[in-house]
UniProtKB/Swiss-Prot annotation:
InterPro entries: Hist_DNA-bd, Histone-like_DNA-bd_CS, IHF-like_DNA-bd_dom_sf, IHF_beta. GO terms for biological process: DNA recombination; regulation of DNA-templated transcription; regulation of translation. It comes from the Bacteria. It comes from Buchnera aphidicola subsp. Schizaphis graminum (strain Sg). This is Integration host factor subunit beta. Belongs to the bacterial histone-like protein family. Heterodimer of an alpha and a beta chain. The keyword Glycoprotein does not apply. One of its GO terms (molecular function) is DNA binding.
Length: 93
């Protein structure tokens, strides 16, 4: 699902809220999550999940086109761990 599809789906469910407000709220939430992660903070949304950073140590990788070995530097990557309620909803049959 793209951001624009998300805006449309929310607008369908919440017809009393303008599309501009929905778009602004979603963009602001995503921006806040990005800024918080860039500062090394963890974001927990109860019932939905937790956004955090995971450390990856340096290692030797391989260029998929050439097969040449390259050194990959240490880095942090964004990580999302779904909460129990989200996991339960995803596995509901």
């Amino acid at each position: 699902m793209t951001k624009s599809e998300l805006f449309e789906r929310i607008a369908e469910r919440k017809a009393h809220i303008s599309n501009k407000i929905i778009e602004c709220a979603v963009k602001e939430m995503l921006e806040y999550i990005s800024i918080s992660l860039s500062k090394g903070k963890r974001i927990e949304i109860r019932g939905f999940g937790t956004f955090s950073l995971h450390y990856r140590s340096s290692r030797i990788g391989r260029n998929p086109k050439t097969g040449k070995k390259i050194k990959l530097n240490e880095r942090y990557i964004p990580y999302f761990k779904p909460g129990k309620q989200l996991r339960d909803r995803a596995n509901y049959k």
